Swiss-Prot record:
InterPro entries: Class_I_gatase-like, GATASE, Imidazole-glycPsynth_HisH
Taxonomic classification: Bacteria, Pseudomonadati, Pseudomonadota, Betaproteobacteria, Rhodocyclales
Entry EC no(s): 4.3.2.10, 3.5.1.2
Main location: cytoplasm
Name this protein carries in UniProt: Imidazole glycerol phosphate synthase subunit HisH
One GO location term (cellular component): cytoplasm
Catalysed reactions, semicolon-separated: 5-[(5-phospho-1-deoxy-D-ribulos-1-ylimino)methylamino]-1-(5-phospho-beta-D-ribosyl)imidazole-4-carboxamide + L-glutamine = D-erythro-1-(imidazol-4-yl)glycerol 3-phosphate + 5-amino-1-(5-phospho-beta-D-ribosyl)imidazole-4-carboxamide + L-glutamate + H(+); L-glutamine + H2O = L-glutamate + NH4(+)
Keyword Cytoplasm in annotation: yes
Function: IGPS catalyzes the conversion of PRFAR and glutamine to IGP, AICAR and glutamate. The HisH subunit catalyzes the hydrolysis of glutamine to glutamate and ammonia as part of the synthesis of IGP and AICAR. The resulting ammonia molecule is channeled to the active site of HisF.
Any one of the GO BP annotations: L-histidine biosynthetic process
Length: 215
């Protein structure tokens, strides 16, 4: 029987590419078991928790509540090593302009859409939304960047980004028409807008750092 201290729970609320996330985690798990789960009890028993997400924010919030997982997510965010990915990062904030919906409110701040009037290069060439593809991340000090060079490229697919009220949360910045926050961290929580599971060696290194992290 697997001990709780050996498990990494990947929260399944029907809105993420969970196979890619779980396979990447298994690659770096070092003997810990990766469990994809919609069971709040399994989330509560896990040593650490990964909260992925993709799709529209209103759908993500609705599905999270429909599966009775809100309380489990909020509890895990208080006291376990916790990694949010993509919409899983956005849902940690108070509100999203996508559908004008309230989110979980773990962090103060909002989720904003890329501003159309800023979506161009200095040459005048238009930038497409969603922001899709590889882009450089400028780091701010955090244990989860260990072994990853500043300016490394990660894979993004998104039209919205977080705007924290407290800039001390910001652990990574990217630029696409405008500079935007692409990673946040506080205490036991680290969350990223990009997809580490799709980001080759550096993405796997970040996941490995999370698996080993003792905040």
């Amino acid at each position: 029987m697997t001990l709780a201290g050996q498990t990494i729970a990947v929260i399944d609320y029907g809105m993420g590419n969970l196979r890619s996330v779980s396979k990447a985690l298994e690659h770096v798990a070092g003997g810990k078991q990766v469990i994809v789960t919609a069971d709040p009890a399994v989330v509560a028993a896990a040593e650490r928790v990964v909260f992925p997400g993709q799709g529209a924010m209103p759908d993500c919030m609705r599905e999270l509540d429909a599966r009775g997982l809100r309380t489990a997510v909020l509890a895990a965010a208080k006291d376990k090593p916790f990694l949010g990915i993509c919409v899983g990062e956005q849902m940690l904030f108070e509100h999203s302009d996508e559908g004008n919906v309230p989110a979980l409110g773990v962090f103060a701040g909002n989720v904003k859409r890329f501003p159309d009037e800023k979506m161009h290069l200095p040459t005048g060439e238009r930038l497409k939304v969603p922001h899709m593809g590889w882009n450089e991340v400028r780091q701010k000090p955090h244990a989860l960047w260990s072994g990853i060079a500043d300016g490394s490229r990660f894979y993004f697919v998104h039209s919205y980004f977080v705007e924290p009220a407290d800039l001390a949360l910001v652990t990574g910045i990217c630029e696409y028409g405008v500079p935007f926050t692409c990673a946040v961290g506080r205490d036991n929580i680290f969350a990223v807008q990009f997809h580490p599971e799709k980001s080759a060696r550096d993405g796997l290194q970040l996941l490995k750092n999370f698996v080993e992290w003792q905040p």
